Regions:
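Solvent-exposed loop segments that connect transmembrane elements
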Residues: 90, 97, 106-124, 181-198, ...
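N-terminal periplasmic/intermembrane-space "pro-region" immediately following the signal or transit peptide
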Residues: 27-180
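Transmembrane beta-barrel outer-membrane domains
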Residues: 156, 202-208, 245-252, 302-306, ...
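Outer-membrane beta-barrel "beta-signal"
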Residues: 566-586
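Transmembrane beta-strands of outer-membrane beta-barrel pores
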Residues: 169-175, 230-236, 272-274, 327-331, ...
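Detector for outer-membrane/organellar transmembrane beta-barrel domains
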Residues: 384-527
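Outer membrane beta-barrel
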Residues: 128, 143, 148-188, 193-341, ...
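Bacterial N-terminal signal peptides that target proteins for export
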Residues: 2-15
Length: 586
């Protein structure tokens, strides 16, 4: 029996067909009766009792067929009731396996998870969801589309695409003019004896807005992801940003491809460094990383991070352990970027800053990758996820440096540095997480947002790495539609000094008489909230956010009468609209 849609043509045709068959049976019986009643050439007329017997037999046949029709009608009604019940439970439950709002640029952990309700096309006829046929593709982007629901992703060929991004408006206030736009330059807070230390600032910014896309697919059992993300913190030559147009410049943040088959995973492109603490596994997806929940686009002092090109290979022995190795873009960094102070070079090697060592030259596009590097930075990492409430990762990094004596080209100087990072992210009680991230290095200070140099140069041209470390201790709590957070973090930069060739002039970092821009430590206390005001998987979400930030920095050397430290206060407020979209489960 082939039943079609409830209330459709198939259900109406079946009773009609049955009635037609019953009528044909009745007519056939009547024809038989008539034939029996007609006399043959050699027969005599049938007696009256014989005709009565035929009539009774016809009545009995009609009664039996009537019972059969009633039984069939009752069966149809029962099947109709079962279909109605099934459609009722389907329309009130969740459709799909998506988590709704959440896979949005780099704020996935910020947005509270919203369930995805059924999203059906208006239709007077309820249609059951088509069942997957035997041997149907496992790739949801190749499966037949569900004509009842509006999917939270786009289909292009055999891949799924979602937009990722949000639009931000961020008013912010600082009690000192850091001249650093929206992000904090942790290492260059003005001192109170400087003009900028006595001038406050208030600005509006949309620079943190982001646009991008994510592509998912499955080819012969290999699940691949392509991810792209831009913000508007790029640099440009125009000078009318605050005068007439506010023409901020897009900047590439992320652009990578990841492929996984079985236990092996491979990633290539520009991504967050594998040294960034994770929330889950060793995934490069922004929502699986920990870089705090703050509004400050430079995040928090002490976070180990960078976004740079590289390659990585991951091995998943099981669902609870991941091991990875990566080769990422190296840099012979001696300070001078993002508010970090540069080292003092020996006189004979002062030219290295513009030819062989990076003293902030790699900040602008004109000199991007202008500084040579002998090898990539190599990173190894292992992550443990025994359950959804606990994540632990341990990472190690190797850095390599090489210079040439500009007056004696046959003389080379090399040095190897490294560091270790330990991160813990634990949900101690429901909706309350404690976070700890700790880093110690000897020649990897660049990964602390450039606040520490990697190395110094001695008078003879030899290289010496600089100790640098950091810590982050924080808490994150979710109360209904609001995320609350608070962090303490800090950076320590070790002293590494030497004498110049004259034997009296000090060089390096943190020496007696060094500029007060050469910091010994930077500390931060910050807290804030992120509240989801409205969320709909078909339209996106609106969030309001707030953050307070207190920063302190202390130099290695304090001249007579000079301030021993400086600090500032910053208040951020943010209104965000997040684009809708989420990927199906593969």
């Amino acid at each position: 029996m082939n039943l079609r849609t409830p209330g459709g043509r198939g259900v109406r045709i079946l009773p009609a067909a049955l009635l037609l068959l019953a009528g044909a049976g009745i007519l056939g019986a009547a024809d038989d009766a008539t034939t029996t009643a007609l006399p043959a050439d050699s027969a005599t007329a049938t007696s009256a009792p014989s005709q009565n017997d035929e009539i009774e037999r016809l009545k009995a046949a009609l009664a039996e067929q009537q019972k059969q029709l009633q039984t069939l009608q009752k069966t149809l009604e029962n099947q109709q009731a079962l279909l109605d019940k099934a459609m009722g439970s389907q329309s009130t439950g969740k459709t799909g396996t998506f988590t709704g709002i959440g896979q949005v640029a780099s704020t996935t952990p910020i947005v509270p998870v919203a369930p995805l309700p059924a999203v059906a096309f208006p239709s007077p006829i309820a249609r059951p969801r088509p069942q997957a046929a035997a041997g149907a593709p496992k790739n949801p982007c190749e499966a037949p589309p569900d004509t009842n629901a509006v999917p939270p992703y786009l289909r292009l060929g055999n891949v799924c695409i979602i937009p990722v991004g949000f639009m931000d408006l961020t008013p912010f206030w600082r009690d000192k003019n850091g001249a650093s736009q929206m992000g904090s330059n942790f290492g260059s807070i003005p001192y109170n004896n400087a003009v900028n230390g006595n001038v406050s600032e208030y600005h509006f910014s949309v620079q943190n807005s982001r646009l991008g896309f994510r592509v998912d697919g499955d080819w012969q059992g290999t699940h691949f992801i392509g991810y792209n993300e831009f913000d508007f913190n790029g640099t440009g030559g125009a000078t009318n940003y605050a005068v007439s147009n506010g023409a901020i410049v897009p900047r590439l943040r992320l652009f990578w491809i990841d492929a996984r088959k079985g236990k092996i995973e491979f990633l290539a492109g520009q991504s967050w460094s594998m040294l960034v603490p994770n929330r889950k596994g060793i995934s490069a997806l922004p929502g699986d990383l920990f870089y705090s929940q703050v509004i400050d686009i430079n995040y928090i002092a002490g976070l180990t991070w960078t976004r740079q090109p590289g390659l990585r290979v991951l091995f998943h022995p099981n669902s609870k352990v991941t091991f990875g190795i990566a080769a990422e873009q190296g840099d012979q960094y001696i300070g001078g970027s993002a508010g970090g102070s540069a080292i003092t070079l020996p006189t004979a090697y002062a030219g290295l800053a513009s030819t062989q060592l990076d003293q902030g030259q790699n900040v602008t596009l004109a000199s991007y990758l202008g500084t040579p590097t002998p090898a990539p930075d190599f990173i190894a990492k292992i992550a443990f996820d025994p359950n959804s409430r606990l994540h632990i990762d341990l990472a190690g990094i190797e850095t390599n440096f090489k210079t040439v004596n500009p007056t004696l080209l046959s003389q080379h100087f090399t040095k190897t540095g490294g560091g270790v990072e330990l991160g813990i992210n634990a949900e101690v009680i429901k909706n309350l997480r404690l976070i700890s991230s700790n880093f110690w290095s000897d020649g990897a200070g660049r990964y602390l947002f450039g606040q520490a140099p990697d190395l110094i140069v001695r008078a003879d041209g030899s290289l010496s790495t600089v100790h640098a470390g950091s810590t982050i201790e924080g808490v994150e709590a979710r109360v209904k539609n609001t995320l609350l957070y608070g962090y303490y973090s800090g950076i320590y930069i070790g002293r590494n000094t030497a004498f110049d060739a004259n034997g009296t002039t000090r060089i390096g970092y943190g020496y007696s008489g060094s500029p007060n821009s050469q910091n010994r430590d930077i500390q931060e206390i910050t807290f804030g909230f992120n509240q989801t005001m409205w969320s709909n998987p078909r339209y996106g979400a609106i969030n309001v956010m707030g953050q307070y930030e207190w920063l302190l920095r202390e130099p290695w050397f304090v001249a007579a009468g000079a301030p021993k430290e400086t600090h500032d206060n910053t208040i951020y407020f943010n209104v965000r609209y997040t684009l809708p979209g989420s990927m199906p489960n593969f």
